[in-house]
């Protein structure tokens, strides 16, 4: 939220609509909870928990093992395990590379530890603005459950409009990108 407040201070803005795209949806929700000058908020996509999004790319047993290894600080083993998964999945490879780039981390272990900070459960009840939540019905990265969870967590929002885009609109995927026809 501090960068948003700094920008609003610099430009002497008293009311703003804040729009967050992809991970920015999570960041915009977090900023709105702390910044009363944000009057309206648009989040597409909605990421309630970046750590969970990344771990869901693995099967149940490796997911549990990864959580334990992260708690134990087993950096080399975590990095090796994630490298094996990334080799088989372009989505995991992309998510890992993009995640490390955005968070300024240099390993899978570091990124997963940092990803725990990117969640909305602790701030959602503080959001009092008008909120528009957008999601794709077949998002390859963010599970649709997080969209439903975010709607439920916004207990004090002034208003909530939630829109789920579908394949028939060519907007079913992450950030409402689909297979757009020419």
Region locations from a protein language model:
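Alpha/beta-hydrolase active-site loop
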Residues: 1-12, 30
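Short beta-strand/loop motif that positions the catalytic acidic residue
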Residues: 127-128, 133-135, 139
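Catalytic histidine-centered segment of alpha/beta-hydrolase-like enzymes
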Residues: 163-181
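Active-site nucleophile loop of the alpha/beta-hydrolase fold
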Residues: 42-53
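Short glycine-enriched nucleophile-adjacent loop
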Residues: 18-20, 25-36, 41-43
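Conserved alpha/beta-hydrolase "acid-adjacent" motif
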Residues: 140-146
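Helix-rich cap/lid subdomain of alpha/beta-hydrolase
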Residues: 61-96
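Active-site nucleophile elbow and catalytic-triad environment of alpha/beta-hydrolase enzymes
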Residues: 105-123
